[in-house]
């Protein structure tokens, strides 16, 4: 199941072992809370346990088989569990499957992990996908949260919040809470512009969009705005280079988003999906020439040419592709 459906699912079904995985830390934290909130736990100090990465699976199973202390249920959380490889991986899977055959509803064991792959195929384990939400889902969350706080917000305004925060729910939640505290009834577009900080990667994405559209004036204005705000030219160079490098590989390989993310050392595959639409506006050879422009700019930066002028020249060269 995914994060969106889990709350309703947990109302009617019990799962002795769950694996919460994905790339959104806020969602994973909320998912853990959702599981714990569904349980009937008295004396949480002695019936709720958290284990770190190095815990042994035998120790976990022993803890699970120990009865709760004056409580109907207990809760065991394992953060960043290091799943072994090879023969030991098979042993761990076998032990977990054996435990699940006799597990009752007195204990819930939750693993929090970056990925689900090590746990796939273990009979009885429920996987909870907490990957970054789509923009539409984030907008729905913002709208619902504002309504609970007695605030109104238009879908277009909620969309702007999600975009400025790159659908990162930790930032979305913080910024939405801030806006609800600021506005008395209606959260407006002006409120968002005033209070919500645009993620630099979002601004690089918009800059890349403007460059791909051959909008010279907008591209140079956006770049100057970033420089005026205090962004360092070398930092902008690195972000823009990564953006074009991802586009180049999107256009020149047949890899999946996750394969590209792994190859490029990108932790989250949504960063690859993000650039796909813009990449399709270029021919592969244009993107190869773009990387050549970056190589030339990098050489000049290393020779201590004026950094601001060189990053502006780089953008002009990209516009000319």
Regions found by a protein language model. Name each.
Residues 1-321:
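Conserved beta/loop motifs at nucleotide-recognition and modification sites
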């Amino acid at each position: 199941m995914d994060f969106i459906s889990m709350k309703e699912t947990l109302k009617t079904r019990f799962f002795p072992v769950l694996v919460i995985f994905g790339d959104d830390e806020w969602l994973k934290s909320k998912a853990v809370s959702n599981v714990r909130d569904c349980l009937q736990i008295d004396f949480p100090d002695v019936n709720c346990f958290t284990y770190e990465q190095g815990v042994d699976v035998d120790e976990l199973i022993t803890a699970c088989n120990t009865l709760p202390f004056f409580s109907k249920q207990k809760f065991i959380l394992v953060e960043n569990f290091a799943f072994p490889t090879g023969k030991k991986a098979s042993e761990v899977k076998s032990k977990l499957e054996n435990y699940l055959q006799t597990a009752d509803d007195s204990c819930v064991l939750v693993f929090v992990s970056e990925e689900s792959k090590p746990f796939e195929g273990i009979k009885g384990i429920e996987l909870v996908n907490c990957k970054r939400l789509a923009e539409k889902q984030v907008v729905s969350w913002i709208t619902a949260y504002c309504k609970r706080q007695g605030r109104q917000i238009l879908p277009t305004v909620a969309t702007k919040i999600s975009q400025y925060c790159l659908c990162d729910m930790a930032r979305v939640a913080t910024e939405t809470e801030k806006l609800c505290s600021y506005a008395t009834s209606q959260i407006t577009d002006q409120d968002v512009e005033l209070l919500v900080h645009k993620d630099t990667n979002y601004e690089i994405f918009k800059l890349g969009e403007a460059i791909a559209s051959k909008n010279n004036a907008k591209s140079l204005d956006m770049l100057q705005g970033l420089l005026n705000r205090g962004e360092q030219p070398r930092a902008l160079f690195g972000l823009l280079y990564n953006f074009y490098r991802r586009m180049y590989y999107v256009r020149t390989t047949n890899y999946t988003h996750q394969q590209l993310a792994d190859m490029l050392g990108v932790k989250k595959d949504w960063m690859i999906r993000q650039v796909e639409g813009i990449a399709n506006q270029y021919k592969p050879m244009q993107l190869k020439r773009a990387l050549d422009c970056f190589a030339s700019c990098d050489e000049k930066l290393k020779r201590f040419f004026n950094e601001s002028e060189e990053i502006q020249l780089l953008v002009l060269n990209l516009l000319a592709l």
